[in-house]
From Swiss-Prot:
UniProt-recorded name of the protein: Glucose-6-phosphate isomerase, cytosolic
Organism field: Arabidopsis thaliana (Mouse-ear cress)
Result of changing residue 432 to I: In strain: cv. In-0
Effect on the protein of changing residue 99 to I: In strain: cv. Bus-1 and cv. Kas-1
Control of this protein's activity: Inhibited by glycerol-3-P (G3P).
Effect the entry attributes to changing residue 355 to T: In strain: cv. WS-0
Length: 560
């Protein structure tokens, strides 16, 4: 299907929603929430998950109009094109097939006419075999000791996604048992402090390093890889590198040149974007080393269950589609630029940072997929913290400052339940009391009249008034197992894609990260010249020159 040069904002469906905004401005969530039929229609269940979006500033009519917008944007066709392996990442001429990474063995998903699923499972089987060897102790380090500690080196999607999943599983009873005696750490930043923190307390003799870089040229990752190679070599000799370092890469020549056995390189493909790569060897290898492949396979099955739901469910009952349309409504029509992701689960503390990248790198675009400047805003500013920590941090602004739509994520069954004798409720019930209360506090607020009835002094009434009418949605998961973690990941991945499909942008490239890299190269050359030859900074503006001079004059870096 050829792309259309028309912008979505030129369609009747978009204009209809623009006019509808005036109707919504006349409503308040206090009134909308009193309509039980409306609320019931805004609850969706799938596979034990419950989505409640009744606290969105939307009516049944709004949802009908958003579904018309989906039709106008050719959303059905765009989803099909993604699953069919068409090159929907047009600026890089690539398919977008992260769904193939978690597809069942008998599935058929094609890229350039070839079924990629067998290739995916070849890598998964190789990961299972390798991780079993490491975990069983049949593969040992250079001094004959088992490798019980893993450092995964990667940046961006090679780090944020796997870290989110690792953190979510750390306290799951089954995962906890399977990881007994093992450690998994992630090294991302080129700041030497990150290196120091990662190797602190570790013995090179028992450490395996996983270097994640598709091209094996990523500047930050390769500098950290060389640093850890030096750490291993200094302790165990150069020959130990092949026993203590493996790669996730497709550049076997550079892998071998680095000192890693190419047989210990695990592939992934051009049709996997970095921020969508957690289900590839990028995430599956380090997670399998920590928890065992069978645990990670449950995670993949959870993600796959949402893939199938997304592909086959009518839009009015399709969780990622509904979430994506509501985000478009909040950003492009109601004018809310941000979104708070608020999981009431400490195990999900790294979820918001991961989705921040998935969302903002995907949809932070200013032109259409055809290169036309967009006359409307796309993307959201995503941030978040687990509840109840966030309540004591930034909820003040959410309640009485700017309006920020919120995603509340709750878990029915705690990974680590605690009930203290004499307490009114369990620790988890105390947490969930806040999960249920906060959305209503945002929706209903508190009026001056209510405060007067409570005999609040007149001078405090303006300060204690809550306007309410602040949108949120609630997603309730039955528990937080590897399967549920996979579901949660896929829901948000597809939600982000839906937003991009509707806006008519390319959610799968990231040219915005390139310019800074180019400028950093110029600075790097200057620093080298200044350190080795004493040359003064030149060719920069006054501000950068002044900053560079101060840095060079006062830094304690050794002369090279």
């Amino acid at each position: 299907m050829a792309s259309s040069t028309a912008l979505i904002c030129d369609t009747e469906a978009w204009k209809d929603l623009k006019g509808h905004v005036e109707d919504i401005k006349k409503t308040h969530l206090r009134d909308l929430m009193s309509d039980a039929n409306r609320c019931q229609s805004m609850m969706m269940e799938f596979d034990g998950l419950l989505l409640d979006y009744s606290r969105q500033r939307a009516t049944v009519e709004t949802m009908d109009k958003l579904l018309n917008l989906a039709k106008a944007s050719q959303l059905t066709e765009k989803i099909s094109r993604m699953f069919n392996g068409e090159h929907i990442n047009s600026t890089e001429n690539r398919s977008v097939l992260h769904v193939a990474l978690r597809a069942p063995k008998d599935a058929v998903i094609k890229a350039d006419g070839m079924n990629v699923v067998p290739e995916v499972w070849n890598v998964l089987d190789k990961i299972k075999e390798f991780s079993d060897k490491i975990r069983s102790g049949s593969w040992v380090g250079a001094t004959g000791k088992p490798l019980k500690d893993v450092i995964a080196i990667g940046i961006g999607g090679s780090f944020l996604g796997p870290l989110f999943v690792h953190t979510a599983l750390q306290t799951d009873p089954e995962a906890l048992e399977s990881a007994k005696g093992r450690q998994l750490r992630f090294l991302a930043n080129i700041d030497p402090v990150d290196v120091a923190r990662n190797i602190s307390g570790l013995n090179p003799e028992t450490t395996l390093v996983v270097v994640v870089s598709k091209t094996f040229t990523t500047a930050e990752t390769m500098l950290n890889a060389r640093t850890l190679r030096e750490w291993i070599t200094a302790a165990l000799g150069a020959s130990a590198v092949a026993k203590h370092m493996v790669a996730v890469s497709t550049n076997l020549a550079l892998v071998e040149k680095f000192g890693i056995d190419p047989n210990n390189a695990f592939a992934f493909w051009d049709w996997v974007g970095g921020r969508y790569s957690v289900c590839s060897a990028v995430g599956v290898l380090p997670l399998s080393l920590q928890y065992g492949f069978s645990m990670v396979e449950k995670f993949l099955k959870g993600a796959s269950s949402i893939d199938q739901h997304f592909q086959s469910t009518p839009f009015e009952k399709n969780i990622p589609v509904l979430l994506g349309l509501l985000s478009v409504w909040n950003v492009s029509f109601l004018g809310y630029p941000a979104r708070a992701i608020l999981p009431y689960s400490q195990a999900l503390e790294k979820f918001a940072p991961h989705i921040q990248q998935v969302s903002m790198e995907s949809n932070g675009k200013g032109v259409s997929i055809d290169g036309l400047p967009l006359p409307f805003e796309t993307g959201e500013i995503d941030f978040g913290e687990p509840g109840t920590n966030g309540q004591h941090s930034f909820y003040q602004l959410i309640h009485q400052g700017r309006v920020i739509p919120c995603d509340f994520i709750g878990i029915v069954k705690s990974q680590q339940p605690v009930y203290l004798k004499g307490e009114v409720v369990s620790n988890h019930d105390e947490l969930m009391s806040n999960f249920f209360a906060q959305p209503d506090a945002l929706a209903y607020g508190k009026t001056p009249e209510q405060l007067q009835k409570e005999n609040v002094s007149e001078n405090l009434i303006p300060h204690k008034t809550f306007s309410g009418n602040r949108p949120s949605l609630s997603l309730l998961l039955p528990e937080l197992t590897a399967y549920n973690v996979g579901q949660l990941l896929a829901i948000y991945e597809h939600r982000v894609a839906v937003q991009g499909f509707v806006w008519g942008i390319n959610s799968f490239d990231q040219w915005g990260v390139e310019l800074g890299k180019v400028l950093a190269t110029q600075v790097r050359k200057q620093l080298h010249s200044s350190r080795t030859q004493g040359t003064a900074p030149e060719g920069f503006n006054y501000s950068t020159t002044t900053l560079l001079k101060r840095y060079l004059e006062t830094s304690s870096e050794p002369q090279m």
